[in-house]
């Protein structure tokens, strides 16, 4: 089901645009579809046919996604394993201070070598209302004021559905445009389409290395943009929407944590409208990668920050409960057969 399908479903019951707006807003806030306002009861506002049909609509919306399990962590985050209607699983993460990270695909075709999600390949796309349903489930647990499309999947490979979800959350969902974050490895279509949207989200770009060859090794199926081209495209978008690009850098000991790489970051980002997020690697079973020591991470942050690049450390939420992206899903689906599909282009 997509957004237009929901509106058509309500229209078939006799709902006018004003009625649809209230019903959709109630759902997006995690409330009952016939939730009244302080000044008006549902029976005084919604047509009889709509009121009679709402229980069935509510059941259909509940069937889009359900909470399979919740895993609170010591850092205040909570990982949600969400089961979709076809029994596929995706993850979303409730973050401290009102944030939520949602998944846009079941699996991923990019195949980043340090990501658990990429190991399964792409299984299927997540629909726009399946993304929104992750927000609804989260809002029933705590307030959500920021949504980052940074969970399982590459949003650029499911662009139509992601942009539709962003539009819905940025309008009827009541989330500020700067608090909607589109994360991508850097697909040219993103830079073409995002500036034309009614809701223009913040942008996070996966950099991970300033050396083109190493970046290709780390992100083997990412579009062939050089680090320089990626930063130029990001800067143009940042200046257009007037908020900075977040550059993502997963810190891998002995691979991309050298001073040579840090000098490359300074070369690319100094003077840019940008924030560098250093993300210490979250170890997975059976892999050869490690995060640098805490002392080394502090050293790198100080090196960049003191030379003019705003730098933050972003630890993966819920590290004590298999917090790496895709790890909960991998554990839940262990032993089940899965079929990979090629990425559907937007």
UniProtKB/Swiss-Prot annotation:
GO terms for molecular function: 4 iron, 4 sulfur cluster binding; metal ion binding; RNA methyltransferase activity. Keywords: 4Fe-4S, Cytoplasm, Disulfide bond, Iron, Iron-sulfur, Metal-binding, Methyltransferase, S-adenosyl-L-methionine, Transferase. It comes from the Bacteria. S-adenosyl-L-methionine binds at residues 153-154, 183, 206-208, 282. The active site is at 91 (proton acceptor), 325 (s-methylcysteine intermediate). GO terms for biological process: rRNA base methylation; tRNA methylation. Binds 1 [4Fe-4S] cluster. The cluster is coordinated with 3 cysteines and an exchangeable S-adenosyl-L-methionine. Its EC number is 2.1.1.-. InterPro entries: Aldolase_TIM, Methyltransferase_A, rRNA_lsu_MTrfase_RlmN/Cfr, rSAM. GO terms for cellular component: cytoplasm. Its main location: cytoplasm. Residues 94-320 form the Radical SAM core domain. Its cofactor is [4Fe-4S] cluster. It holds the Pfam family Radical_SAM. Disulfide bonds join 101-325. CDD domains: Radical_SAM. Belongs to the radical SAM superfamily. RlmN family. This is Probable RNA methyltransferase PA1839. It comes from Pseudomonas aeruginosa (strain ATCC 15692 / DSM 22644 / CIP 104116 / JCM 14847 / LMG 12228 / 1C / PRS 101 / PAO1).
